[in-house]
Structure formats: C-alpha cells, structure tokens
Amino acid sequence: MQTTYSRVARLQAYLKQESLDAAFVFDSDNRRYLSGFRGSTGYVVVTQKNALFFTDFRYTQQAGEQCPGLEIVSIRSEADVISYLASHTLRRLGLVEAETSVRLYKALKTGIEHLETAAIDSELLRLRMVKDAQECASIRKACEITDLAFSAMCKMIRPGMTEAEVDRFLQDYMRGFL
C-alpha cells in the first residue's frame, strides 16, 4: 500500500511543479504502476490532491482489492471519466501521449472546454526507472523462478523437441509459481 501512495505522491509533486491539474493514465503499464490494478480495463486520474481509479462494474471489486489509496469510481464508459474531468475544472491535463488515440484526444478536447494537454510520458518513465522495494522484491522473485525453470528445462530437453514444446514447458512450469 505504501508503494502506491509513494508513486502517486511523486507524480503529484510533478503535477504541481508543471502546473498541471491532473494526469489521465490508461495504458496498462502506467496504470498498474500507479494503482496496482492487474485487470484489463481502468483509468487512473491523479490530481494534485487526489487519486482515483475509474472502471466498470465488472472490475470494481478487483480494483478495491488491488488499488489501495485510490478512490474507486464505477463508470459505464470512458465518457464518464471525461465528464468527471470536465466537472472538476481540470484544464491542464497530463497525458501519456504515445498511448493516446486520436479518437480519445478529440473526445477530451470536445468534452472539456479550453483543455490544454501536456505529454507526461518521459516523466512516468523517469519515475518508473527508480525501483522501489516492492519492485526489487518482484525482480528477485522473477529471477528465482527463472533459475528454477531453466534448471528444470535443462533436465527435460532432448534432441527432436521443438521450440514450441520447450516454450510450452517453460510457460507451464513458471505459471506454477504464480
């Protein structure tokens, strides 16, 4: 939980420094980094004071379990997130430019009067470059699993096996640790 708070706090400091009202994050890598959410559908909105996670009814329970410190908001569609942004007078919005489609950009510009956007891609990458304790522990665990899987594969591999068979073995072996 502390990790999520720390990550959000670092982004909030950046928002203040750059005079951005909020960051709107929806790509899976940055969404998971900021919220902890492992599902496939959700939007993170970080303002200078709050952090919210928007998702539809299918994922609200999962979000509640995986997104400590973020307010969970149930929505019907992406348009509900845009309505939230518009109703809270968020005019300077940070976006992950590389992940923002033309359709979404147009919807934001249409839905939020006088909206200014700024790319936050490089800042999120900078934040993610410095590993916290949770990430270090995950990397260590992944290395342990990889070492065990490689050792097991070395014992079972034989001439005539295809790459697909070896891959399937490794995938199945590693999934056993999750």
Predicted regions and their residues:
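Terminal domain-start leader segments
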Residues: 1-54, 79-90, 108-117, 151, ...
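Structural motif
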Residues: 26-28, 55-57, 76, 95-100
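Short helix/loop capping segments that flank catalytic or ligand/cofactor-binding pockets
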Residues: 33-34, 62-63, 103
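Compact, glycine/acidic-enriched structural inserts
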Residues: 55-84
